[in-house]
Amino acid sequence: MHNAFLFYKVPRFDIRGKEYLRGQGKYYVVDLGFIRSQLQRKNINRGFKIENLVFLELLSRGYEVFVGKYNDKEIDFVAQKDEDVKYIQVTDHIPENNTRESDNFLHLPTGYQKMIITNNWDDVGNIEGIPVVHIIDFLI
């Protein structure tokens, strides 16, 4: 299916070791309608759809996109275009008293933009200095 251009395989990148991790890629679909047609159900995980949408938007903006790994934490996206590097976490919503999305950023190298993208307007704001942006604001 990858050769049919239905999916993008995104490599995992070890941020600390600055190397690609073999065999640990993550897949994103070119068209979410394809997944829905194959699964024949309407309730595809919203978090997956939002993450897939952010991935496609980053590609359209000319970023090279990786899935980041730092120690045992996953960073949804490391997006790089020339010298511009962004660390991005994507979530449908941030549960109360849950710091998983921001904790993944705590030990990352400084100097690069960090951002959490959410589908919940109530989450928009700032968590420990990290901007939390609504998906619509990210897309425009």
What are these regions (language model features)?
Residues 35, 138-139:
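A generic structural signal for short hydrophobic patches within well-formed alpha-helices
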